[in-house]
Amino acid sequence: MIVEHNVPLQAYNSFGIVAKARELLRVRSQEDLAAVLADPARAAAPKFVLGGGSNIVLTGDVKPIVLKVEIMGRRVVDDDLRATVVEAGAGENWHDFVTWTLDQGLPGLENLALIPGSVGASPVQNVGAYGVEVQDRFESLDAMDLHTGRVYTLDAAQCAFGYRDSVFKHAAPQGEEGSATGFGLAGRALILRVRFRLPKPWRPELSYLDLQRRMAETGVTQPTPRQVYDWVCAIRAAKLPDPRVIGNAGSFFKNPTVTPEQCQDIIAREPNIVHYPMPDGTVKLAAGWLIDACGWKGKSVGQAGVYEKQALVLVNRGGATGGEVVTLARAIQTSVYERFGIRLEPEPVVV
């Protein structure tokens, strides 16, 4: 395990916000983490788990001990006629892992290509894109309890997946302990490894209009997994800025869901609103459209701005602070609520 002090975090968060960690521990194995918890001083200290840094907004220097997850490794752990189960260390880059599965001839994650972040963060956020979410391919994960050092395995039900949500995003109720089977593991668990079940035979997920357009443009009627992967990468690259060039955290707000009755009421006032019926009977509204309709595209608060090509993305125009990002986000939330009566929920965690 590598221990560092007064570590600049600009390179460790995709917004590129300037901040420091008082102490940063590079956790490269389960044994490294066990050693941290065996140290009485560090075991008792507050901790902040840092993966790929693609879903956080830093508003200042990080005082808790930063656990930088760098647990690597990829392998096939099971294979039969129905599915192949693959496992990756929590520190693996998500897109690189998706690419690796295709290189191994194991399709199923191609719709999730080019999503920033780490493998360990993918179930925390239940990342999803173009008709597929992590929960659709999830098998199980191993995590360590940061209070007790116990390692346990969670299945999909225990992870309590929801739309960009999981058990790892919620703290246990005050006075109660989070558990492997109960709700509330935020700040309590560190994910070590994640396993995904890739079903056989492979069937492409092409329900999204952008993918259907690519099929029409190319004349392909039966795409291969690699073609779907390439289309997804091209679509995302055209819509979203590269965080290596323009700091951002991808989609900043969740797409809100409303009842059909609420949707009809909004349509009566806003006939052009972009909306999608969901299998559970609710209606999902396009948060980017709501923000754009309120006139925010291209606007800024300090050096934090709304991306000109996609209003759902907030960007660092150069030297933005976390406070400016938060102020901009709150102003957008207020505008959308005042016009549509809808409360937008941010995706990134504010630290």
Label every PLM stretch briefly.
Residues M1-T148, Q158:
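Anion-binding (especially nucleotide phosphate/pyrophosphate-binding) glycine-rich loop
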Residues V336:
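Conserved ATP-binding N-box helix of the HATPase_c
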Residues E4-H5, Q10-I17, I56, V151-G323, ...:
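Phosphate/pyrophosphate- and phosphate-bearing ligand-binding catalytic cores of soluble enzymes
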Residues L106, G322-V325:
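Beta-rich strand-turn-strand
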